[in-house]
Regions:
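N-terminal lobe/hinge region of extracytoplasmic solute-binding protein
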Residues: 10-67, 98, 174
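Short, solvent-exposed loop/turn elements at domain surfaces
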Residues: 17-27, 52-55, 137-140, 189-192, ...
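Surface-exposed binding/hinge segments that line
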Residues: 109-161, 178-185
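Aromatic- and charge-enriched surface segment that lines or borders ligand/interaction sites
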Residues: 61-106, 122, 128
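Short, low-complexity disordered leader/linker segments with a strong preference
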Residues: 1-6, 117-118
Length: 228
C-alpha cells in the first residue's frame, strides 16, 4: 500500500469486506463485531479487558440514576473532537440514540425501544435517558462489555443530513476515534487507516492515557493496514 513498514501495523482479517468503502456501522447488513470500524468508533463506555472494568469514553462518568433506576443522567466528556474539527457533545449522543429508536431498519432499534422511552439533551454536555422500567444495568447494556456495542456515537452534523442512514455508505467517515480511512481496496481485500494529525483530540488521546499508561512522547502507529 506504499507505506513504510516501520510505520505500519498489519492486521490480518478472516474474510474480505462485503461492501468495500462502507464505514457506516448502521448501514443495513453490517456485522458490528467484524472489527473494521473499531479504530474509528466512539462509545459511551469502553472496557478495560485486563482489569475487567468499564470506564467512561465519550461519557465523562458512569451515569447517575434516580432512586428507582428509571432515569439516567450522563455527563459527556469535554475536549473530544470529530476528525473534521467539530466538538463531540450531547447533540451527537442524543441524535445517535434517537436515530436508532426512530429507524426500525437499524438492527438495535427494537431492543432500544423496548427499554428506552426518551433521550433528551439537558445541556451541551449532559444527556438524560428516561427508561420504560427500572434499569440498573444501564452502562453494561449501552456500553462495551465484551466484543463491542450496537451503540456507536455518530456525528450529528453529518448523519442528520442523510435521507436514509441505513443506505448511507459513509465512504469518507468523520470519526472520533484515533484513525481515519486513508484508502481501501475496491475488491474488499484491505483497508488502510491513518493516525489523525490531531489524534490527541480523539477518544484515544483524551481518554487513553488514563487507562493505558502511555506518555506524551509515545505515539501510536502512523498506519494500520487491515488485510485479508
Amino acid at each position: 500500500v506504499g507505506t513504510n513498514r516501520d510505520e505500519t501495523l498489519v492486521v490480518e482479517t478472516q474474510t474480505p469486506t462485503d461492501t468495500p468503502g462502507q464505514f457506516n456501522s448502521y448501514m443495513s447488513g453490517t456485522t458490528m463485531g467484524f472489527g473494521i470500524h473499531q479504530l474509528m468508533s466512539a462509545h459511551l463506555w469502553e472496557m478495560d479487558t485486563v482489569a475487567g472494568e468499564q470506564y467512561p469514553e465519550v461519557a465523562a462518568d458512569m451515569g447517575t440514576p434516580n432512586e428507582d433506576f428509571t432515569e439516567w443522567t450522563v455527563k459527556i466528556r469535554q475536549g473530544l473532537k470529530w476528525s473534521d474539527g467539530e466538538d463531540l457533545n450531547a447533540d451527537d449522543v442524543v441524535f445517535t440514540f434517537n436515530m436508532i429508536k426512530e429507524n426500525d431498519k437499524i438492527g438495535a432499534s427494537a431492543a432500544t425501544n423496548l427499554y428506552i422511552d426518551k433521550v433528551e439533551k439537558v445541556d451541551d454536555y449532559t444527556v438524560k435517558f428516561t427508561m420504560k422500567e427500572s434499569f440498573p444495568r444501564f452502562t453494561q447494556r449501552y456500553g462495551i462489555t465484551v466484543w463491542g456495542t450496537d451503540y456507536r456515537i455518530v456525528p450529528e452534523h453529518i448523519y442528520s443530513q442523510q435521507a436514509d442512514v441505513t443506505t448511507y455508505k459513509d465512504e469518507k467517515p468523520v470519526v472520533a476515534g484515533p484513525y481515519t480511512v486513508e484508502d481501501y481496496d475496491p475488491n474488499g481485500d484491505w483497508i488502510l487507516y491513518k493516525l489523525r494529525d490531531d489524534w490527541q483530540d480523539s477518544t484515544l488521546g483524551v481518554v487513553g492515557a488514563d487507562h493505558y499508561g502511555y506518555t506524551a512522547d509515545q505515539v501510536p502507529a502512523k498506519y494500520v493496514w487491515f488485510r485479508y
